[in-house]
């Protein structure tokens, strides 16, 4: 299994994320984080919300994979508990997660993905990545009946 988290952000590897990456390997899952922040995003965010959203889509589109499940994290999307999240992931070998910038996703991009919400609350990119990585590890623990999820 391979899970990739694509994010509109300048940098990533947080210590806790590295721990979850290591823990996911025991289940045969490579957990990868890819931060994308081309110059056009910084410029677009200064101009308008619509242009910013378009720039996020342009950054993410090359990573949409028709042979994977593509999941856009969106605060207004479907949400569920850890068991529902594990059910959603268990039948896929390739899973791509997308975390937009401050202005969110274009509707067009959301139509190319399955949308999922971590919470009704708004998180910084760093916190969202940590929560997502922990939930991926928890989902794997549920799938493989590991005692981490009690």
From Swiss-Prot:
Record CDD domains:
RlmH-like
Q: What is this protein called?
A: Ribosomal RNA large subunit methyltransferase H
User: Into which EC class is this enzyme placed?
Assistant: transferase
Quote the subcellular location field of this record. Cytoplasm
The lineage is: Bacteria, Pseudomonadati, Campylobacterota, Epsilonproteobacteria, Campylobacterales
| Cited function | Specifically methylates the pseudouridine at position 1915 (m3Psi1915) in 23S rRNA.
InterPro entries for this protein: Alpha/beta_knot_MTases, RlmH-like, tRNA_m1G_MTases_N
Query: HAMAP family recorded for this chain?
Result: 23SrRNA_methyltr_H
Record organism: Helicobacter acinonychis (strain Sheeba)
């Amino acid at each position: 299994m391979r899970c990739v988290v694509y994010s509109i952000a300048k940098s990533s590897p947080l210590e806790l994320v590295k721990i979850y990456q290591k823990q996911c390997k025991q289940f045969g899952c490579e957990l990868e984080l890819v931060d994308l922040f081309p110059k056009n995003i910084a410029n677009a965010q200064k101009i308008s919300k619509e242009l910013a959203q378009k720039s996020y889509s342009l950054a993410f589109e090359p990573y949409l994979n028709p042979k994977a499940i593509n999941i856009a994290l969106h605060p207004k999307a479907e949400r569920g508990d850890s068991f529902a999240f594990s059910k959603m992931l268990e039948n896929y070998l390739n899973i791509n997660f997308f975390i937009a910038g401050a202005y969110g996703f274009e509707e067009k991009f959301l139509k190319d993905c399955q949308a999922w919400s971590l919470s009704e609350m708004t998180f910084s990119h760093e916190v969202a990545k940590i929560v997502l990585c922990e939930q991926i590890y928890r989902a794997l623990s549920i799938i493989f009946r590991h005692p981490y999820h009690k």
